[in-house]
């Protein structure tokens, strides 16, 4: 689906022929804060399929059969190959992202706001404390499954979404975003990336991993410099 469709219509952007996330039960109008999660919410509530997945316009799952040096569009996994993988697993994820010199916790607070995670942890402790050990373990690690990319059996995805949005909607009500930039206000998308592994670990869910195809040019030098700058010269937070 086309995420943020309600805002596209409001801002008079031309239609491009995709199903919007503003049909049926939806939270499309909250896309500025929830990012691709408005599409995930829409899919969980409006699609009747055995498996449901989410990728991005600039990130796709890669075929295991194609060379890393093949043209990017040719490296995107085919329907047939993905189905063959799903015949042996209920969940497909991107390979873990490794920070090496940062934990998942320190990477987040150096890039965003510490209060986001403080509030999130308090909500988990209050609403579903059985997830707290896995959440804390994930935050202490230097790697994890990020990007909000996955394919899941529908029943699992609905379970995940019920749990995820229950936390995020409480966070939306409780979080003070005074002084947040436009990027900071995408907080619920950022936080959700840090919740997936806690859900997987607590529910003992197995999965398969795939590489990612980046459709846009990746300036790794710029990304690495920004990463180090955030670590050694973090912005002040409350």
PLM region spans:
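A solvent-exposed, charged loop/short amphipathic helix patch at secondary-structure junctions
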Residues: 13-24, 66-72, 165-182
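Short, small-residue-biased leader/transition segments that mark boundaries at the very start
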Residues: 2-9
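Short acidic donor-binding/metal-coordinating loop in glycosyltransferase active sites
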Residues: 56-59
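Conserved donor-nucleotide/metal-binding helix-loop-beta segment in metal-dependent transferases, i.e.
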Residues: 62-116
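Catalytic core and acceptor-binding pocket of nucleotide-sugar-dependent glycosyltransferases
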Residues: 120-219
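Membrane-proximal basic amphipathic "stem/tether" segments
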Residues: 216-238
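Short aromatic/hydrophobic "clamp" motif used to bind/position activated sugar donors
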Residues: 52-54
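Active-site-proximal specificity loops/subdomain of glycosyltransferases
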Residues: 10-46
């Amino acid at each position: 689906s086309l995420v943020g469709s309600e805002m596209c219509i409001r801002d008079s952007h031309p239609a491009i022929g995709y199903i919007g996330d503003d049909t049926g039960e939806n939270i499309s109008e909250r896309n500025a804060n929830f990012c691709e999660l408005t599409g995930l919410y829409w899919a969980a509530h409006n699609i009747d399929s055995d498996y449901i997945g989410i990728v991005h316009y600039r990130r796709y799952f890669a075929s295991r059969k194609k060379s890393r040096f093949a043209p990017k569009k040719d490296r995107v996994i085919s329907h047939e190959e993905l189905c063959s993988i799903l015949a042996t697993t209920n969940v497909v994820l991107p390979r873990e992202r490794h920070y090496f010199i940062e934990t998942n916790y320190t990477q987040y607070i150096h890039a965003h706001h510490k209060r986001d995670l403080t509030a999130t942890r308090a909500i988990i402790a209050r609403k579903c404390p059985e997830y707290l050990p896995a959440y804390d373990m994930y935050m202490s690690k230097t790697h994890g499954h990020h990007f909000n990319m996955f394919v899941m059996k529908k029943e699992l995805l609905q379970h995940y979404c019920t749990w995820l949005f229950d936390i995020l909607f409480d966070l939306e009500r409780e979080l003070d975003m005074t002084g947040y930039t436009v990027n900071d206000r995408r907080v619920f998308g950022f936080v959700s990336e840090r919740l997936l592994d806690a859900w997987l670990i607590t529910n003992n869910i197995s999965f398969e991993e795939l590489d990612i195809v980046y459709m846009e040019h990746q300036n790794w030098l710029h990304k690495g410099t920004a990463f180090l700058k955030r670590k050694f010269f973090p912005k002040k937070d409350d």
